[in-house]
């Protein structure tokens, strides 16, 4: 199995269940984030895109992209564990970088958990660096507060 066997394409509604399952297998789901809401928001927002990697009809990877005009963001970068180290993640990130560049956004950033050392290493191998920005948060609804 390698990246040549996979095709990157736009997310389609028929992918929804398989995509959520992929995110689950990859450990990306959190109780306070409804993945269906995240998908809906992405596909209905003009400054975002959801791309998937498909091999013979099987969803094996994803990347959710967005930008605010100053920086592009990568969320839900996922590669099924059976496909790790086959170039799928690199292909998704190359796509993400081109997408951000085509939108004339000067910088791309990725979101990941600080303790996810394998993923942090992956990004470093692609030339990404830790930055000195500290993210703060505040939950604005009870559902999120009670689930965190």
List the predicted regions and their residue ranges.
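Conserved acetyl-CoA-binding loop-helix of GNAT-fold acetyltransferases
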Residues: 85-98, 125
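A short, internal acetyl-CoA/4′-phosphopantetheine-binding micro-motif in the GNAT/acyltransferase core
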Residues: 77-84, 112-113
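Conserved beta-strand-loop-alpha-helix junction that forms the acyl-donor binding cleft
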Residues: 110-119, 137-141
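Short acidic, glycine/proline-enriched helix-loop-strand junctions
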Residues: 118-130
